């Protein structure tokens, strides 16, 4: 992938691309009328993007609740960097796992319903198997919340290449995808809301090398 080339071959730290992605995504959020946010965080880089957006939303003075799904992604250094920053800032970080209590589930549902906007950072372009368990539950809660949903890169649950729904998927009102339009978004564009493509400052060299 283009971003992998930029990171591994050119040496751009992935956290820089995540920061670029977060700031690019925020350009498409109404920061005046949306005051309360719930960010749904999955286990990979898409989740890390969600944590990065959380940090910036806090800097704008907004209230942000974070729901971490499936436990902490401790093997992902960028993810953990953002997590520790938010922890030190005193952000309400709710962790939902398969063995979470009904009380935790109800808390998550209430946080979503109280929000002006839900940010979907559960799964990105790497998803290739059906959504199950706590992730399926969280997506269903978001879809049934009557709150607008903003998806980072691609709505969670959609295969970025085929457009196939892998079990269940987020019904996104807005999608900001990075660097290139994803084929899976093309195939679902009639079912989704607004779709925007934003560059995240990946060098032309990386694009040319990968796509030549």
Which residues does each PLM region occupy?
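Structural signal for hydrophobic packing residues in well-ordered secondary-structure cores
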Residues: 3-10, 29, 33, 87-90, ...
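YjeF_N-associated NAD(P)HX repair module
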Residues: 115-212
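Nucleotide and nucleotide-moiety/phosphate-recognizing core
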Residues: 26-122, 130-152
